[in-house]
Regions:
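C-terminal transmembrane helical hairpin of 12-TM major facilitator-type secondary transporters
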Residues: 335-379
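C-terminal ends and interior cores of transmembrane alpha-helices
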Residues: 84-115, 344-356
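Helix-loop boundary and gating motifs at the non-cytosolic
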Residues: 2-57, 259, 263, 267-293
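A late C-terminal transmembrane helix in Major Facilitator Superfamily
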Residues: 390-422
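Intracellular loop-helix junctions on the cytosolic face of multi-pass helical membrane proteins
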Residues: 1-9, 106-109, 113-125, 135-143, ...
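Loop-to-transmembrane helix entry/capping segments in MFS-fold secondary transporters
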Residues: 44-45, 119, 150-162, 389-401
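Intracellular juxtamembrane helix-capping segments at the cytosolic ends
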Residues: 135-148, 374-389
Length: 456
């Protein structure tokens, strides 16, 4: 097997630059979905069910993108056609989703599963957005696995983590920024504010421009080059030589696949609770949002201001991740760096339940950012190193996405039930802040599980 060549900084940068735009879209979704669906009429106990869709689409789409991109060889490349198609669909959906409440759909009559027509439309748009973002996101991880040697992978994924967090900062601050320049942050009942709508519009434009940049700057290897650098016999692709099913590949997966997956379970369940309940936690603890009908009043100015502040907090988290991503490559012990990062994040989550000062929450989210940076960088470095020379890199990375999606699905299903089981908060509403304590406990459990990883 021929050694993969070293790439200069800009070569590694170009491989992942489109990820910046994809992450803006992902950040807008993460920070605003609970806010959007609460505005459309969802109650806090059902919010977690809307969060089933993102991981569900991920667990379906990403393995398929991995499997079929492993088999794709065309003039535009191997992975790039999939990321471009996904980005194009995402752009269209990002222009529709935040307008769900403005399309004159019925917002009072329950039509299916306790949802109104406007909520069903929003759910359909969310499903399409999740599908397209997953299709655009996965190829960037595969490009690094395909083209970067083992020595540079940690650096490549750190660059990807930096771009991911930089994109997150941009996406998270958009609603706050647009409100600051005078775009309305309130709207009639059932309608999403213009500050959020315009955030999605601008995010969509940046997404497609960034993806176009990567498609122009990156030349994927042809089949002969790929085979030579990945130890596959010449004359046939890895799929033609050996085309096992996904179940067979799972059974043959290295031990690291499963041990890393255990850590992933705790981490991603924790982050799902963060995305679902941060809006309610911040609105209740830091902005004294009034109560209406036994729950936080989502039409109040306090709730919408809190929603913008959540974007700022997520941006602080992303900035913390950017800084921490430059530090973790210097920690010699991979397991120690990984575990320490998750412990810091767990402390950040637990503190959220007790902090009432909006600015003091910056500390909580900086700590959470440490865990986020590690979750983006370490698992794929460890896994792709373990898979080196085994072939089917794209399929394995797609299957590994199950360790991201399944925990979120479990957390989304159980989230509402756990919230109902908790005692009410002092204001008489659902105790969303205590969900942050549970998230912190999960991250610390993940930190302990790191030491079970069988690394190459």
């Amino acid at each position: 097997m021929k050694q993969k060549p070293n790439m200069n900084f800009w070569g590694l940068w170009n491989l992942s630059f489109g990820f910046f735009g994809v992450q803006i879209a992902y950040a807008l979704q993460s920070a605003n979905i609970s806010r959007i669906f609460a505005t459309l009429g969802a109650d806090p106990h059902s919010l977690s069910f809307f969060w089933i869709l993102p991981p569900l689409m991920g667990i379906i789409v990403q393995p398929l993108v991995g499997k079929y991109s492993d088999r794709t060889w065309c003039r535009w490349g191997r992975r790039i056609p999939y990321l471009f198609l996904g980005a194009a669909v995402a752009v269209a959906v990002m222009c529709l989703l935040p307008n769900a409440g403005s399309l004159q759909l019925d917002s009072t009559t329950l039509v299916w599963g306790g949802m109104t027509a406007v909520m069903l439309f929003g759910l359909l748009m969310l499903m399409l957005l999740d599908t397209s973002i997953n299709m655009a996101m996965q190829p960037f991880k595969m490009l690094v696995g395909d083209m970067v040697n083992e020595e540079q992978k940690k650096k490549a994924y750190s660059i990807q983590s930096f771009l991911c967090n930089a994109g997150s900062v941009v996406g998270f601050i958009f609603p706050f920024l647009f409100t600051w320049i005078g775009i309305s942050n309130t709207a009639p009942e059932g309608v999403v504010p213009d500050s959020v709508i315009w955030s999605f519009y601008i995010g969509a434009a940046i997404l497609i421009l960034c993806v176009i940049y990567t498609t122009v700057k990156v030349r994927e290897w042809n089949p002969e080059e790929y085979n030579e650098y990945n130890g596959i016999e010449s004359g046939a692709s890895e799929e033609e030589k050996d085309n096992p099913g996904m179940v067979t590949l799972l059974l043959k997966a290295p031990t690291a696949f499963w041990s890393i997956g255990l850590v992933q379970f705790f981490c991603w369940a924790s982050f799902l609770f963060m995305w679902t309940y941060t809006n309610g936690t911040v609105a209740a603890n830091a902005f004294d949002t009034p109560i209406s009908g036994g729950e936080l009043d989502v039409t109040s100015d306090a709730y919408q201001v809190a929603g913008n502040w959540v974007g700022i907090l997520y941006a602080v988290q992303a900035l913390g991740s950017v800084v921490w991503a430059t530090i973790i490559p210097r920690i010699r012990s991979t397991k120690m760096g990984y575990s320490l990062s998750l412990v810091l994040g767990g402390v950040g989550f637990v503190s959220m339940a007790f902090v009432t000062d909006p600015y003091l929450l910056f500390v909580s989210f900086i700590l959470i950012g440490c865990a986020w940076a590690a979750t983006l960088a370490y698992p794929f470095t460890l896994l792709t190193n373990a898979l080196e020379g085994k072939g089917h890199m794209g399929t394995y990375l797609g299957l590994f996405n199950g360790t991201i999606c399944l925990p979120q699905i479990v957390a989304a299903i159980l989230g509402g039930m756990i919230l109902k089981a908790l005692p009410l908060a002092e204001n008489g509403a659902s105790n969303q802040p205590m969900m942050m304590v549970i998230a912190g406990i999960l991250l610390i459990a993940g930190a302990v599980s790191v030491f079970a990883i069988k690394a190459k």
